[in-house]
Structure formats: structure tokens, C-alpha cells
Amino acid sequence: MGANLVPGGGATFRVWAPRATEVYLNGVFGGVARSGQTDDLLFSKDANGYWSGFLNSAGEGDLYHFWVNGPAGGTKGFKRDPYARELAHDKPFPNCSCIIRAGDAYPWHDAGFVTPDFSNMIVYQLHIGVYAITKPGVASTFLDVISKIPYLTSLGVNVIQPLPVDEVETDPSMGYDGADYFSPDFPYVVTNPGELNTHLGTINSLLAAKGLPPMHVADIQSGHAQLQALVDLCHVYGLAVVFDVVYNHAGGFNGDDESIFYYDRLPNKGNPNDSLYCTDQDRGTGGLSLALWNNDVRQFLINNALYYINEFHADGFRYDEISSLLSMNKDSGWTFCRDLTGTLRFVKPRLLQNAEFWPGEFGDFPKSRQDIVASVGNGGAGFDAMQHDGLRGAVRDAVKSASFGQNSGVNISAIADNLFPAGLPHAWQAVTCIENHDVVKTGRDPRTPVLADGSNHRSWYASSRSRFAMGMLLTAPGIPQLFMGQEFLEDKPWDVLPNPPNLPEWDRLESHEGSATQFLQFTKDLIQLRWNHPALRGENVRPFIKRNDDRVIAFHRWLDSGDDVIIVGTLAEKTWFNYAIGFPAAGHWKEVFNSDAYGSSPVSGNAGGVLAGGPPMDGFGASASIVIPANGFVVFVRG
């Protein structure tokens, strides 16, 4: 589909417009403009409504458009190629041309990279346009984000999940109003030759550090190649890339006559059900539902996912609002999900397929979490994992309650009850978080340190309670996900506008601000703790203390092979001394982590460990009295 270069010269073109009477190719090919409705530019139509043609003068970088004549009473005019790999800057969007790009020209360096097991994933969510800004008011690009790869690897995460990167109808955007599903978003692409050379130097330095050959500026000339370069360098440095895709709705297409909306130019623009790709349904998710009852529309979306796998080496997908998709499309939506997941699993079995599904959000299509993650063979939708808000809600509520003072009620037991994700057979099927793009965007809920201390977001109270929240996330079962800036105590809401104050405040780290640098080191060490102890990435968890009066929680993580980890935390404003808890076995238990070591002086702790020699307690065979730092947590392992 779309425009594809042919070995030996020229390109084939193919587009779906079943009710059109004629489709012509127009553009500039080999420096020669070809326009109008002439026989040599007319495509031929097959029995399924697909139009195709070949032009031997077409080549890499050429600009093109399709001219579509609708049926009687319909309209005539240009349409962009729905499969265009890139859009041009020749005219302002949405009236721009498409660009012919080779899908396989990029010189990949990632042959040895393997997508991590789901249980071993630690995800970092970011927005390309604001994550790595170097000039105020100008969105950061795919190549700017490459410069942050060493930072991300030093943090310890092993998956990045950018918000949607395809072309949208309005910029700046979160990315959920997609217009051109196969084209990278304009603002994320570098076109200035001088800037390209600067980025090339960064890329080649990163490649040289890994003993890999350099690239040339021609290798990153296109936006298509720049996104490939981002994924490639991530893989070289051990980072998987999960793409966020939006198949539950299309963009609004306001004033965009060249979009997929009414692609074959049917006369009736009053009924979106006649628009070919869309329906008249809108759940308030940002645009019209896609016509998933149509096999060709379903295949278009499946082809889009395959495109990210084949041409961008995708390691997974976050599927936006699958609950909305199923509600609006009923049986056809269910069929689509099963076709999608089954096809992609056949092509790339290690691919993470993560559904944003909220049971009960739309009661008219009642499916359970287990239905969503059950395999296609067992009658399910076939997704591997889903977003899960149980732990997030419990932790955020507890932190907020604690901020009202030492006499306020704190539901610590809710955290304990949500350590294992409800409704799922396996913990690794839940992607858990404390913050994400939806939760902490401007005008929505506050970031964690603001929840923790509404009057001073960088106080000891804000930092210590935020450490507690991060500790619960990174020691609980599931796939933990961080949101950009969370790792260094970002307290500002985020926004898509590329201007302060709602950008990640990298200057706090560059100026060595204490609260930011200490919290960053805390996050790094806590992530390393998760890597050091496989039990923290396993399935087993047993909360054995959940005392709301004391604001104390304790839980056991273990592997059947014997890796035992005990986590004890509190949201009390006082340190607990001589606090008796159970331990799985008698003997010495080493304190391997203490959140109080990051910003408190003196540190309240257990002098490196405790001797569990007391009587059975909390369902264990031994016990010991420990110190639990105020608004903090400690972690013990055998040894």
C-alpha cells in the first residue's frame, strides 16, 4: 500500500478508494512536475476498490498527491496518501504533499537487541515535543531525544514509551488526534542542515562508544529515518521502544479536505457513516470512531502496527482507550482486537501489547480484565497486559491524606490490597504507575510532591512522601511505569506547549538543586534494587501488615527458589522504633535499602540489618524489632 520504491527504479502506488470513479497520481518526479488528469497518470482499479499504478521516474524524496474524483454528485480534489511515510513542508498542513521514502534504507545497528521479558520491564513515558527542548518555544525532536539516551540508561529503565508520534491535525498536541497514521509529526523532524550535522555528531559519538561504525548525514535526512535513528540508538543502549497508537478514534479533520475523511469523495458529508474510514460515533475521546465493521479499515490499522514493527523495530504498543473502542464497535471491535493481537503475535512473539482498558467505563460492552488478556485461542482479546489503576489510586489517596497532618486518617490497607493487580491472572499483565500523561497534565491532578505537601512542594514532607510513593511502585508486582520528571521530584504539571513552566525542569539537575539530585539518586538506587532482586520482578507478594492507625504497611516478595525480600513502610510523621514484625526465617536480615538515606540527617535505620530471633509473628516463623523511618520505607533481604 502507498508509495513503494522498486529495485531498478520507479515506484508503485496503491490506495483504497472503492467508490471513486477515477484516481490520478500527481507530483514532482525526478524534478519534473506531473499534474492533471491524463491517461498516463490514471490508476487502474481492482474488484475490491483498490487503485494502483507504477511510475518509472519516481524516486526517493519525490513529492506526490492523489487526485480523487468522487461518484456522481460527489467532490473532486487532492487527497494525501493514507500510507505516506512522510509529509512535506512544501505547503502548510493539511495541504502539504506526501514524500516517497524507502522503508528499508536506514543502516540499523540493533541486530543483537532482544525485547525484554514483560516481567523485567521498567517503562518510562515521555512526550517527544517537550522532553528534550533546547530552544524555548520550539518543540524538541526525535534527534533531541537521542541526546537523553545516556541519561535514561543511567536511570535504569529499559523501556521508553513516547506519546503518539504520528502526524496530528493540530500542533502542539498530546498526539491523540492523529490524521496521518504512517507519517511522523512535523515538529519532531529536523530539516535545518546545520542542526542535522550537530545531531549527527551526537549520534556518532554514541555509536563510537559502543564500537559501532558512524553514520552519514544522508542517513538521517528524512523524518522517517530520524524516528528510526531514535529507536536504533535506544536499542544499541538497551532501551526497548513501545509506541502509543490510537485505534479507537480518528482525528476531527476540521478543515482538512485532503485527509482520510470521505476519502473516495462521496457526496453526502452530512453522515460520517459514509466517510469510508469513520462512523458517526464519538465517545468524547477526541474524534469519530473508526469503521471497524469494515475489513479494509481493520486491515489499515493492522498494517499500521506492522509498519511500526517492520520499519521501526517496535518492541510493543500501548493501545489507547480499548474500552472505548469496544463500546463503540461492539462485536466488530472485538474481532478487530483479536485479529490485531493475533497477527502481531505471529509476526513478533516478544512484542508487548498493552491495552488501555478500564472495566466498567462503558457498561454497554461488559468485558472483564481477564477477557482482555486471555489468548485468542482461549476466547480472549489476546492482549498481553493492560493499564491498571488500583495501586495508583491507593498510593495517591494515601499520600494526599497524609498531607493533612498526623491526625488525619490514611487508608494504608488499600495499598496493601492493591499490590497484586485485581482481576488479572499474572502481575506482569498490569502496567502500574503513580503518574502518567493523563493524570498530571495541566488542569488535571497534581504531581506527587504537590499531593504530598500542598504548601511547599520541595519540603521534607513532599520529598519523603514522594519517596514512599515511588517505593511502593518499584517494589510492587507488575510492570512499573514512570512519567518524565517523576524521577527527580518534578512538581509542575506538564503540557504540550514547548514553553516553561510546564516542561521537565532539567535545570534543577544541572544546578545540583538538592531536592532534585537527591531524589534522582534515590530513584536510580531503587531501580537498581529491583534489578538486583528478582523477587521484586516476580509474581509472589503477601502483605502481612496493613495498619491504618499506625500508617504502617509490610509485605513479602519472594521467589520459590528462595529470594526473600521484606518491604516495610510508613506514612507516619514520626519514626517507629522497636516495631515488631515477622520475618520468613530466623537469622540475620540485611537492610539493603532505606529511603531515609536520601535527604534526612541523621538517618533513621537499622545499622545495616537486624537479627530475627523472636517468636513467630505475622504468619512467619520468626520476628524482630526494627526501625521504620518517618514517611519512609526500608527493605530487608536474607544475609
Q: What is the meaning of each model-derived region?
A:
Residues 73, 324, 360-362:
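Structural signature of outer-membrane beta-barrel domains
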Residues 15, 27, 55, 68, ...:
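Glycine-rich, histidine-containing beta strand-loop boundary motifs that form or position
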Residues 84-88, 105, 111-118, 127-314, ...:
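Substrate-binding/active-site clefts of carbohydrate-active enzymes
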Residues 1-120, 147-153, 462-463, 474-482, ...:
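Carbohydrate-interacting/catalytic domains
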Residues 186-188, 218, 292-294, 327-331, ...:
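Short, contiguous acidic/charged loop-to-helix segments that flank catalytic cores in large enzymes
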Residues 148, 226-230, 297, 301-308, ...:
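Alpha-helical packing segments of well-folded alpha/beta enzyme cores
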Residues 17-19, 29, 47, 57, ...:
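Short, flexible loop/turn elements at secondary-structure junctions
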Residues 89-94, 313, 329-499, 531-594, ...:
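Conserved alpha/beta catalytic core and glycan-binding cleft of carbohydrate-active enzymes
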